[in-house]
Amino acid sequence: MANQQSFIRPTDLPSWATLTAHAQQLKTCHIKELFAEDNARFSKFSIELPRILFDYSKNLITEETKAALLALAKESDVETWRSKMFAGEHINATEDRAVMHVALRDKSTNPIMIDGVDARPAIDAELERMRKLSEKVRSGDWKGYTGKSITDVVSIGIGGSNLGPLMVTEALKAYGSKSLKMHYVSNVDGVQIADVLEGLNPETVLFVISSKTFTTQETMTNAKTAEQWFMAAANDHGAIAKHFVAVSTNRKLVTAFGIAEENIFDMWDWVGGRFSLWSAIGLPIALSLGYEGFVDLLQGAYEMDLHFQQAPLESNAPVMMALVGIWNRNFLGYPAQALLPYDQCLHRFPAYMQQAEMESNGKHVNWAGEPISYGSVPLVWGEVGINGQHAFYQMLHQGTDIIPADFIGSIEPTVSVDGHHDALMANFFAQTQALMQGIDADQVRKELTAKGVSAARIEEIVEHKVHKGNRPSNTLLLPKVDAKTLGALIALYEHKIFVQGIIWRIHSFDQWGVELGKVLASAIQPELAVGAADNAKHDASTRNLIAFYKAAKK
């Protein structure tokens, strides 16, 4: 297990003290003044990669800030821990596991050693099985129980087994199959699966069930509902093998369900759920895009992996993104982070990154199990930017909390409609400028005077129209949302998460907060049956809520 017990807390590092003092000095500065003082600011605080331009110049930082943040990364041994992760060491200490989702997209020919075994043959074997199945389904050669080809794929999973494939297939829909429709079910509510199944033909549907243990409550509840719906039409348990495949490690339960051995895809415990779309969990991606599209996604991520490993810290996009985030969170005290894609293709990206960031770094103790005295992950939230402008941007511009934002846009749209993309991107560029510059009272007075508003009326409303600005943002400009670029974008954020977890000295690759809720839900579910005894062990609120629910549903 990688040694995480003897470490220096971030607050005890010299650079932390330097940054704390420096933040107090900079809090009286305005970002627009920093631009006025330095014509080369953009080039100093941006990184151009083949697939992503990362501009962080609209943050309240100077060259002194950058130097101190880089010192923090050095003193935190980010480079050493990066090497440990890529070498397959057990940096997931609470579960005693390697963290090797990066191995799934490694396009070199080098051995991938994990726990003394070269994982490359197993990875390549699963990729080959994904290729064969996806090509067979997409070509129409995969036949259902009545001899018809597949027209619809229903992916059943939750968390990382759902969010990743859903986000990617939505983002790359323009490149996907027009004859194979993709559907996703995650919610145990029942409404979602009922909506998905309505109108589908049992003779032409393929279900992909993704559950590492094949016991995940939400996933298996939906899987059993799908099975019942299918069997009502097929009336032959043997037909399940032609309409269900699984991604799981529990072969015994999967085969008992009726899924053929050759249609069970493997997972590994060194791949966390929220980082698993690169594995067979990404089978829906291969089915939608075709296997070559899935390989392009892996290629884009691999290119970012190489950049993360090889680029100097000061020109390393994941490192600088992580450091700017820590500066905003821990030294300027900003409580949240907005993700604002200005590309409809990326409309599921904020939800995907919510899980990736908050499930990874939403922790309250350090490696030694001690409560931390500093903030960990901020609240991550967002929406497609142009919709957000007419919803919550009012708060971003004039609210009492300053919320840093990542603006993500593309130079070329995946679907071109005359005039639309330039109109979209005009808003994209304008919003980051407006958040940074703001508008002061004198400017407001001049504008209102020019419109003929009376002096008395101006004084009544001037303060309501003032925007203080000084609201930080990052801009990520992509050439186009395609598979390689999306792979690079996802990997950029993955490595940002890793770097921040190392600096915060928290375990980024477990999720015990998720596990607690599962345990309690399993205990409560039997109590909801009519006639079941009440459990006096619950707190008064939970006990009475359960009683009210049971009484009302009789």
Positions of PLM-derived features:
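C-terminal helical/tail subdomains of lipid-metabolizing enzymes
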Residues: 474-531, 538-553
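Extended, charge-enriched "interface" segments that sit outside catalytic cores
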Residues: 7-146, 423-425, 429-456, 500, ...
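Substrate-recognition/cap regions that form aromatic- and gly/pro-loop-enriched pockets
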Residues: 397, 409-487, 491, 497
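Short, solvent-exposed amphipathic alpha-helical segments in soluble enzyme
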Residues: 168-173, 198-202, 223-225, 261-262, ...
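Short glycine-rich or small-residue beta-strand-to-loop segments that form or flank ligand, phosphate
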Residues: 151-157, 207-213, 336-343, 379-380, ...
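Active-site phosphate/pyrophosphate-binding segments
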Residues: 229-418, 425, 438, 469, ...
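Gly-rich Lys/Arg/Thr-decorated short loops/hinges at beta-loop-alpha junctions or inter-strand turns
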Residues: 106-119, 173-180, 371-373
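Glycine-rich phosphate-binding loops that contact phosphosugars or nucleotide phosphates
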Residues: 132-140, 146-311, 523
